[in-house]
Amino acid sequence: HKIGLKQRGGSTLGGRKVWFDHDVLRLNYDGRGQYLGEFQSDESILIIQNNGDFYTTDFDLNNHYDADIQRIEKYDPEKVWTAVLYDADQQNYPYLKRFTFEATAKKQNYLGDNKHSKLILLSEQVFPRIQVVFGGHDDFREPLIVEASDFVGVKSYKAKGKRLTTYTVGNIEELEPTRMPEPEDTTEPEAGDDEATNDDGDNGQMNLF
């Protein structure tokens, strides 16, 4: 039998359910505020701030959090995020990047070191679609619709990403996705089907990434 350690709210059986109260910016185990999930002792919380800073914490009730929280959730190291930003290092052209957040107690910034870079949108969709509507002297152009997963690969959060356009932009927004991730197949493979199963797995990876 697997016995968990009683640590930072951990339970001897199963995990610890954790909530975040946005009014007081504190965690609790009593059902107040946003439900973050059920945590094992080695799992952590991801905090994303409006200025692009992010960091991870444990789920200790004594933790303090800043007010300008854009997202707070259970940290998933494999979750892919899509960001569109005006890159101040690149003449404020709009860039699209896809990345995973790293576990870090020290604040990092996924928008880069230039404080003048500006976030346009941050999406957690698996297959996000981005629409660029042109403005100014380019407003006669048809809107550009980008399938983010086809446009750029998943890199580090430090990567620049890929420029969307050099034309004058009116606005950029996220559209409803037309593709959804396929549900995971939990059925046991039959004997002798190993090769077919492996092939399917490879294809699935290629489709996702």
PLM feature spans:
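C-terminal interaction appendages of subunits in large macromolecular complexes
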Residues: 1-209
